[in-house]
Amino acid sequence: MKRIFTILAAAIICCAGIQAKVKAETKDKEIKLVQDWDKTFPKSEKVNHEKVTFKTQYGLTLAADLYIPKSAEGKLPAIAVSGPFGAIKEQCSGLYAQTMAERGFITIAFDPSFTGESSGEPRRTASPDINTEDFLAAVDYLSMRDDVDAGRIAIIGICGWGGIALNAATQDPRIKATAAITMYDMTRVNGNGYFDADDSEESRYSARKAWAEARTADLKKKTFTQAGGVVDPLPEDAPQFIKDYYAYYKTPRGYHKRSGNSTDGWRTTGCQAYANTRFL
């Protein structure tokens, strides 16, 4: 009997050690926030600004810019902002957030999981589930603030984040208003291509084959390849929407070194999860 207890005790200690190791290995990496103003837009004199972080239910830490009106009194309505898809909070989502704070809202612009200053490995990865949770976690954060009226929380999704915002709003009655700005449905874009140009069995198979080959290549090289950001140099015959992307992300107006759209884009397989999911 004594020997049995000894074996059980050893097993418990071993299991505890394994659990501690797993916990240490899966612990979210500590993120480092840039405290200097490095936005692509001027700082407003009408609002106070600070960097904040909050957790998602996937255990990731999101970095956000918090904007509060200097004239704030009592509990205020609040807005969470994100997008465009592949952009960061230092770009237009931050400008939207700051502008809405000037108009009396407490706002945050956040970096989605795996991008910008937020945590998550490998970098530049997208997921319809995780990205929807990003918005819900932002609502969690705002709803717990003492200066926020939790009954008046809204979200703004820009470009590809417009579809994600709508998906989040269908799941969370705490979201009282939703705005989708120049919306793309990223599930449809990844599945069918821009303007449904690849809406055929042959095109979809080619996409799946390319993703599979990219995964194999990454495994062999033991690194993740990037798909590339906005095309540079800009072809003369580029469609207007590509010219619009270039005019923002690749010029001083909107370029930022942490932005995938401004630099090397998503991982080659980083948006694969969107292809067989539909928001709308």
Predicted segments with their positions:
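Alpha/beta-hydrolase-fold enzymes
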Residues: 166-251
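N-terminal cap/lid segment of alpha/beta-hydrolase-fold proteins
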Residues: 28-74
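The serine-hydrolase catalytic nucleophile loop
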Residues: 86-98, 112
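Conserved serine/cysteine hydrolase catalytic core
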Residues: 271-280
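Alpha/beta-hydrolase active-site loop
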Residues: 125-146
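Alpha/beta-hydrolase fold nucleophile elbow
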Residues: 147-159
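Short beta-strand element of the alpha/beta-hydrolase
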Residues: 74-84
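Conserved alpha/beta-hydrolase
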Residues: 99-119
